[in-house]
């Protein structure tokens, strides 16, 4: 709440009245920055805001401190028109560019028809409408987004007006007619006749009917077919044959128009290929008599997913996860801290999100409205990992580099693996030190941004994803398709090479399997002026730049080499057929080739004879007098296009078996030659050797300057050394492509319902000509005609070295000049959308509106679909008031600072704004406006003029109402797809809804597919040292994905209670659905439960009841806990080690709860990847304390970090001697210590919601917060409540009383009856109804004692229900009181009810603190009648807390914890494997397999490992007598031995009033602290 007017200091009025008498500086400062004295009065300040849960229940110190704690524990304290748009993207003739009335009329007619068809389909489907991606004059068919399995029915083929029942009764003739109607809505009689008699068609149509096969696919060693039946013509019915004919005719018509093919052209065939550029792109190649055609459907953006339609006025919070490609913590040097000016070894961590068009940098993952940096990827040139050899100032790890030689020596391997270990272990606080890790850079037109990643795997992942996004933005048209046409007359030469040879050891393994081939087509770049050809000025500039570069590399090149380009196509199948067909085409076109060669030679002569700029002029009309096909391409031609080829060029050279055809050879009559040679032209084939001779893990080859100058790709000969290799290298990766066939009818819909003449309009022609990056970029209409190039981008070389146009001084001068006129602008209100004729704020100058809109789009990295509504000048209240400009867009409220040196920016989606209202300003001179944001603090703005504030309020409310009315029917462009937690308005789902929508499941599955693809890329890189970003096609015929060729054997190892095992069952079921084998190894008590879910079971030692009793008794980490654990569980630990080792035999991947303590050692012995997963903080961080050492009051980041070090040290001291003995005797491994275990580097999965446990920015890349792993056992559906319970709840509702749940599980307390009495009294005083689950008991309880003392009688306001399924009960009540376990806390949050937590032990203290911090509940430090009564009243009546709990529930229901965990497993699998390989290499290097010796390692006390700790370890002292471990006497805390136990001494602790649960003795509430100086 803002301060009242009467609280404003009178000095403020005086300051305002005397403003005109002050100097210019005072007038300026008073207008820019309001007086700051209000900061101490404004309760809305973050420092003064009342913390949720910090209510009377906790503020009354006497209530909780003076009274007895009754509960004191014992001893404790798709789109249908995508391909169609591609087909007719270029069908209009150049003469039609100006447009005409007929074409515009046809466009309007077809647009209306398409709208009717689309609305008809939406009404038929009766399903939620998918969001549409940004599109330019094309539409998306919702049916494509449906699950593949759901589309395998005949309903897709039914006419628009028929339902399923009617369609199923149609006779064959009617069904044929429906097929015709579906494919040809205009009932083209000529096409129907042509389908019946193909001889009536043109040559091209007849050839397509004969040779086009849309489902052409064959199984290979690297491509597996799933559920695909390849039928022959004999097996097809007449209906199927007719459908194929109509479909092929439709394709022929579109191919002819989009590629400008002649009727006399002949279609030879279509083939599946991979285009090799900076990505490996899956696609198709068409061969005709006159051209080589390539096209592909790029993957659709996944922000097409939306929630279901809701009722008017409601809403549903839906974040922008559909638009997020990757997110995580990265280091970055920013000007904010002087990092870009001063070279330091430090960096600062930020939260970075990669989206479809931007990279956005935030301070933390919880503050996504105020970005620090926005990088527009539409202006991005390239992204790459920085190698130390290329940039010595980047400070990457010096130890991770590739040797100059290709062969790997054992000595180099030893140094590399050893250094990799040591570098990883040097990090103590990862938030600042960047001596390890890797840098990568993102180069844009204006600036180069550098980011620091913790591992090379993470850096590669970021770079690969950025490269894929940039490729799609720069190399596709607005319809998300890649198109290329190479006229045969422009082809200079082509050759076919084998990618892999036949190695000696595998020469017979493949039998008759066809080997992959690469087709290299060399053609004259921009040789023909086509639809996508460059303009004269751009062609001249690009040819000049590229020729200069090539001349520097190879001064002896011929002119045709300088003007040529190479395109590489990888064919896993049909390589020989493609080559022979291309030979046949060339032979048939030899006459055209001669004509072309004459023209080409004339160009060469001009180049060699002329000086100046005329030599590279574009072709003139005189050149066009000869009829030749026109070149078409959406691909860029920059010099970074073939980075994969460049990588392969760096590999060692060898001879290859090459088929080569050089069209420019003078040895034949028509300039053609067909030969079989040993040319090394195939750079792709060099990929083979790297697979058979892998480079070192993480290696990056250091090259000398001479090596860096790679040979020109146009050269055809060079001396090489050959090594033959079969496919076994790729097979050993155990990954393969899997293709599943889509429904034929769904494929047909991609070619139907067309807008025949839509591309004839000038606007559509321009949009289809531009790349997606330019099509989505902010633009202003210009009277000059735009160049016809596909990108309209400057050549990268022209802006790479550009310096800033304005110096720092000039920019400051401009800022001061702007500020001098700021008072005249304070009252400026601008409307860019006219409200009515009397709108005085509306800017009527069209050009001015366009300029302002473009600036708005550019400053916030929006695309050109975002519209500006209004703008204002105001102050936004943050830590200090910041003056700037507010922009109201159609879907966002944005702000940018106008103060020099202040870079505050805000992008707030309107979808997250509940409402806004007027408030009084900080003083009389200002008028306030407050924005109420869901799940966020209120945002305050202050205006110097009241009329501006009132207009801003009215416009925001108007836009909110407009968005609510539009609801889900608004296009995706009106939703916030770029920033923040955006979504769509609809009715809030009730808290009882716990199921996830199918769209969210699809999104999670899509992310898993990308994770598998990333795993495959990692495997290729580890095996070959090549960075190969792979882009899979979104084909209408097949769905291609990467899958492991064999099932992995997962072992999930955990100990503890039922709550510890349940998440692993949920994860195991998810892995089973992925096709893997899963075994859970845990206590025998849970065997029946686990096997019942279809998961294999293996038993390990331990009694969960005893473990729980120990934890409850001691509450948290303490000296008494360590003593009792050592005395009682030493024998159990040995059994745990032995049984766990036995249970993990045969595993491929081990996932372990770190409480089991054995996973790292077993994985090292088995040589398998190892991943940790847990429900509480276990990673070193400054954000959260260790779950077992939670202080009563927050002590800051340094304390939090040291708690993790303390716990790691204490736990290792307790088990180190037994573990080391077990390693030597059972595992055959050497002794280890905490330093070499490097637990910090192990991949970690937190099965906690990121809403409750937001990932910290100092988490390393391999730590993932996935969300809760909920196990849906159907208990809510199967549970039958008793009649008494139903009546009790109905009566409470009838009496208008709140219903709460109270249950603490089976805890043991000092006095159970007193606890029951306190609960009864609290419930009665709070006037609520209680469902009680009484499971607690006395420490000294016995049957005789229980009979002697009567049980507490429960009043009618309390119903003792016993155990009830949480997922059934919690959605039906108003609040819950429990002990704070991870599972119970997640259940209450998912149900959306406020939670009261009374922690007893372990992580319960952490969750109590977190629930209170996020404002969704209350944490009770002491439980008694008074405190519980106050908490119950607050939880059932605090509207803010209730609303917060509901909002958290909405977010939790959108999470897919299990699927997110599977995605993370795939992402981190190769990194986890590399850690184990490094450890094994270290053991091998020191010959430590027998465990007889251990290398000397200097380590500090926190890692010190002493064998004297174990009295039973005398036999080991002799073998280790010669080994010495140095101790550092300057540690932060000391370790003292007392009865073989460890006491932690922390000198930084203050007085005993600050209770710290770290070493209290049983029954003592005060912390025992030893003076560190003694």
UniProtKB/Swiss-Prot annotation:
UDP-alpha-D-glucose binds at residues 1057-1058, 1060, 1333, 1364, 1366, 1379, 1382-1384, 1403-1404. Pfam families: EryCIII-like_C, Glyco_transf_28, GRAM. Residues 253-288, 854-920 form the GRAM domain. InterPro entries: ATG26_PH_GRAM2 (IPR048065), EryCIII-like_C (IPR010610), Glycosyltransferase_28 (IPR050426), GlycoTrans_28_N (IPR004276), GRAM (IPR004182), PH-like_dom_sf (IPR011993), PH_domain (IPR001849), UDP_glucos_trans (IPR002213). Residues 107-121, 128-138, 149-170, 702-711, 964-976, 1510-1533 have a biased composition (Basic and acidic residues). It is an enzyme of class 2 (transferase). It is found in: Cytoplasm; Membrane. Residues 139-148 have a biased composition (Acidic residues). GO terms for cellular component: cytoplasm; membrane. GO terms for molecular function: sterol 3-beta-glucosyltransferase activity. Keywords: Cytoplasm, Glycosyltransferase, Lipid biosynthesis, Lipid metabolism, Membrane, Repeat, Steroid biosynthesis, Steroid metabolism, Sterol biosynthesis, Sterol metabolism, Transferase. Residues 37-48, 692-701, 712-722, 985-996, 1563-1574 have a biased composition (Polar residues). Belongs to the glycosyltransferase 28 family. This is Sterol 3-beta-glucosyltransferase. It comes from Debaryomyces hansenii (strain ATCC 36239 / CBS 767 / BCRC 21394 / JCM 1990 / NBRC 0083 / IGC 2968) (Yeast). The lineage of its organism: Eukaryota, Fungi, Dikarya, Ascomycota, Saccharomycotina.
């Amino acid at each position: 709440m803002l301060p009242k007017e009467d609280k404003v200091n009178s000095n403020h009025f005086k300051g305002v009245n005397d403003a005109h008498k002050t100097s210019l500086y005072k007038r300026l400062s008073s207008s820019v920055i309001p007086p700051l004295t209000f900061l101490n009065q404004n309760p809305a300040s973050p420092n003064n805001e009342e913390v949720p849960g910090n209510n009377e229940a906790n503020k009354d110190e006497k209530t909780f401190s003076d009274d007895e704690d009754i509960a004191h524990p014992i001893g404790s304290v798709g789109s249908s028109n995508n391909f169609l748009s591609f087909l007719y993207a270029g069908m209009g003739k150049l003469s039609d560019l100006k447009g005409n009335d007929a074409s515009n009329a046809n466009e309007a007619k077809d647009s209306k028809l398409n709208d009717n068809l689309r609305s008809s389909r939406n009404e038929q489907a009766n399903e939620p409408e998918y969001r549409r991606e940004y599109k330019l004059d094309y539409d998306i068919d919702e049916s494509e987004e449906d699950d593949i399995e759901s589309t395998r029915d005949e309903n897709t083929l039914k006419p628009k007006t028929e339902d399923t029942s009617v369609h199923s009764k149609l006779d064959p003739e009617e069904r044929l007619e429906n097929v015709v109607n579906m494919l040809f809505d205009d009932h083209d009689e000529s096409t129907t006749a042509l389908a019946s008699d193909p001889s009536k068609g043109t040559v091209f149509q007849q050839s397509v009917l004969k040779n086009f096969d849309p489902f052409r696919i064959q199984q290979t060693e690297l491509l597996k077919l799933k559920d695909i039946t390849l039928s022959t013509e004999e097996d097809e019915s007449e209906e199927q044959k007719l459908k194929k004919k109509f479909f092929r005719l439709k394709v022929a018509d579109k191919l002819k128009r989009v590629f400008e093919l002649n009727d006399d052209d002949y279609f030879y065939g279509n083939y599946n290929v991979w285009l090799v550029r900076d990505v490996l792109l899956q696609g198709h190649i068409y061969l005709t008599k006159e051209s080589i055609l390539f096209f592909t459907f790029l993957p659709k953006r996944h922000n097409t997913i939306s929630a279901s339609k809701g009722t008017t006025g409601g809403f549903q919070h839906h974040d922008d996860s559909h638009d997020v490609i990757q997110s995580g913590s990265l280091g970055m040097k920013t000007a904010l801290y002087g990092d870009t000016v001063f070279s330091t070894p430090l960096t600062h961590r930020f939260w970075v999100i990669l989206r479809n068009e931007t990279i956005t940098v935030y301070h933390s993952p919880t503050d996504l409205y105020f970005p620090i940096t926005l990088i527009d990827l539409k202006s991005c040139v390239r992204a790459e990992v920085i190698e130390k050899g290329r940039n010595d100032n980047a400070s990457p790890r010096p130890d991770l580099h590739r040797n100059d030689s290709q062969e790997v020596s054992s000595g180099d391997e030893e140094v590399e693996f050893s250094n990799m270990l040591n570098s990883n272990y040097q990090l103590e606080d990862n938030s600042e030190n960047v001596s390890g890790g890797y840098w990568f850079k993102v180069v844009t037109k204006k600036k180069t941004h550098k980011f620091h990643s913790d591992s090379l795997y993470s850096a590669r992942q970021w770079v690969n994803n950025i490269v894929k996004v940039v490729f799609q933005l720069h190399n596709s048209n607005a319809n998300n398709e890649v198109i290329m046409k190479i006229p045969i007359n422009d082809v200079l030469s082509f050759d076919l090479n084998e990618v892999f040879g036949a190695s000696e050891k595998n020469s017979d393994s493949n039998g008759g399997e066809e080997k992959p081939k690469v087709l290299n087509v060399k053609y004259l770049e921009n040789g023909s002026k086509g639809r996508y050809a460059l303009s004269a000025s751009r062609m001249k500039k690009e040819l000049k730049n590229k020729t200069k570069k090539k001349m520097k590399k190879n001064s002896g090149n011929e002119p045709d080499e300088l003007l040529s380009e190479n395109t590489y196509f990888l064919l896993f199948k049909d390589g020989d057929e493609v080559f022979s067909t291309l030979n046949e085409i060339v032979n048939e076109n030899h006459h055209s080739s001669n004509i072309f060669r004459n023209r080409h030679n004339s160009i060469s002569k001009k180049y060699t004879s002329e000086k100046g700029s005329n030599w590279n002029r574009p072709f003139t009309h005189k050149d066009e007098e000869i009829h030749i096909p026109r070149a078409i391409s959406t691909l860029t031609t920059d010099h970074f296009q073939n980075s994969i080829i460049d990588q392969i060029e760096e590999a060692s050279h060898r001879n290859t078996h090459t088929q080569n055809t050089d069209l420019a050879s003078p040895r034949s009559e028509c300039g053609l030659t067909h030969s079989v040679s040993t040319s090394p032209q195939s750079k792709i084939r060099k990929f083979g050797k790297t697979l058979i001779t892998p480079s070192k893990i993480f290696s990056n080859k250091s090259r000398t300057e001479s090596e860096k100058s790679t040979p020109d790709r146009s050269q055809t000969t060079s001396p090489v050394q050959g090594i033959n290799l079969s496919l076994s290298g790729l097979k050993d990766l155990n990954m393969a492509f899997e293709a599943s066939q889509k429904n034929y009818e769904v494929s047909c819909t991609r070619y139907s319902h067309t807008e025949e003449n839509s591309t004839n309009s000038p606007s559509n022609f321009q949009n289809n000509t531009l790349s997606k990056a330019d099509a989505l970029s902010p633009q202003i209409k210009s009277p000059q005609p735009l160049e016809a190039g596909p990108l309209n981008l400057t050549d990268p070389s022209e802006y790479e070295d550009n310096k800033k146009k304005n110096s720092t001084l000039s920019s400051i001068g401009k800022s001061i000049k702007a500020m001098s006129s700021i008072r005249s602008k304070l009252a400026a209100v601008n409307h860019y959308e006219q409200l009515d004729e009397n709108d005085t704020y509306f800017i009527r100058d069209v050009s001015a509106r366009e300029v302002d809109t473009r600036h708005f789009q550019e400053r916030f990295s929006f695309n050109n679909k975002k519209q500006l509504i209004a703008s204002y000048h105001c102050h936004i209240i943050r830590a200090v008031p910041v003056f700037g400009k507010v922009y109201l867009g159609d879907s966002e409220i944005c702000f940018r600072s106008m103060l020099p040196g202040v870079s505050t920016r805000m992008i707030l989606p309107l979808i997250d704004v509940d409402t806004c209202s007027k408030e009084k300003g900080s003083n009389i001179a200002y008028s306030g406006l407050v924005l109420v944001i869901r799940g966020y603090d209120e945002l305050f703005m202050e205006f110097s003029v009241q009329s501006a504030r009132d207009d801003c309020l009215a416009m925001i409310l108007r836009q909110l109402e407009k968005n609510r009315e539009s609801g889900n029917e608004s296009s995706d462009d009106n939703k916030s797809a770029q920033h923040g937690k955006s979504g769509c308005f609809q009715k809030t789902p009730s808290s009882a809804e716990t199921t996830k929508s199918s769209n969210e499941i699809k999104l999670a599955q899509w992310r898993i597919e990308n994770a598998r693809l990333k795993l495959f890329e990692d495997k290729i890189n580890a095996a070959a040292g090549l960075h190969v970003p792979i882009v899979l096609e979104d084909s209408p015929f097949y769905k291609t994905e990467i899958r492991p060729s064999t099932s992995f054997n997962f072992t999930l190892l955990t100990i503890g209670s039922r709550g510890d095992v349940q998440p692993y069952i949920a994860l195991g079921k998810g892995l089973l659905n992925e096709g893997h084998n899963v075994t859970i190894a845990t206590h025998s008590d849970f065997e029946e439960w686990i096997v019942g879910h279809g998961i294999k079971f293996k038993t390990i030692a331990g009694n969960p009841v005893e473990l729980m009793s120990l934890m409850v008794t001691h509450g948290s980490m303490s000296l008494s806990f360590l003593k009792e654990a050592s005395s009682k569980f030493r024998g159990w630990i040995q059994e745990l080690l032995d049984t766990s080792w036995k249970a993990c035999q045969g595993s491929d991947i081990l996932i372990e709860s770190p409480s089991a303590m054995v996973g790292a050692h077993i994985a090292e012995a088995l040589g398998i990847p190892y991943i940790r997963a847990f429900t509480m903080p276990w990673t070193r961080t400054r954000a959260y304390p260790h779950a077992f050492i939670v202080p009563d009051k927050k002590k800051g980041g340094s304390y939090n970090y040291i708690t993790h070090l303390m716990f790691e040290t204490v736990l290792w001291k307790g088990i180190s001697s037994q573990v080391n003995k077990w390693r030597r005797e059972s595992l055959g491994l050497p002794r280890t210590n905490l330093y070499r275990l490097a637990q910090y580097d192990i991949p970690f999965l937190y099965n906690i919601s990121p809403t409750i446990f937001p990932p910290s920015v100092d988490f390393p890349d391999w730590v993932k917060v996935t969300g809760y792993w909920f196990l849906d056992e159907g208990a809510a559906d199967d549970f039958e409540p008793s009649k008494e319970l139903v009546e009790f709840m109905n009566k409470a509702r009838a009496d208008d009383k709140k219903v709460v749940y109270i249950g603490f599980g089976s805890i043991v307390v000092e006095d159970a009856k007193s606890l029951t009495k306190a609960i009864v009294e609290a419930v009665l005083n709070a006037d609520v109804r209680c469902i009680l689950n009484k499971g607690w008991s006395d420490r000294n309880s016995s049957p005789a004692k229980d009979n002697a003392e009567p049980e507490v009688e429960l009043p009618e306001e309390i119903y003792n229900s016993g155990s009830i399924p949480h997922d059934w009960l919690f959605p039906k009540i108003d609040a819950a009181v429990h002990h704070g376990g991870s599972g119970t806390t997640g259940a209450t949050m998912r149900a959306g009810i406020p939670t009261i937590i009374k922690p007893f032990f372990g992580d319960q203290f952490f969750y109590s603190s977190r629930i209170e911090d996020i404002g969704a509940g209350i944490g009770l430090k002491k439980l008694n009648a008074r405190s519980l009564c106050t908490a119950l009243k607050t939880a059932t009546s605090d509207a803010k807390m209730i609303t917060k709990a509901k909002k958290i529930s909405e977010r939790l229901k959108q999470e897919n914890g299990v699927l997110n965990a599977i995605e993370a497993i795939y992402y981190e699998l190769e990194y986890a494997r590399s850690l184990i390989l490094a450890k094994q290499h270290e053991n091998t290097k020191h010959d430590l397999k027998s465990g007889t010796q251990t290398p000397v390692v200097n380590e500090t006390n926190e890692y010190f490992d002493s064998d004297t700790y174990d009295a039973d370890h005398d036999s080991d002292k002799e073998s280790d007598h010669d080994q010495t471990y140095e101790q550092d006497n300057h540690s932060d805390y000391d370790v003292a031995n007392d009865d073989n136990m460890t006491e932690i001494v922390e000198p930084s602790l203050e007085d005993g009033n600050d209770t710290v649960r770290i070493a209290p003795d049983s029954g003592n509430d005060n912390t025992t602290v030893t003076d560190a100086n003694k």
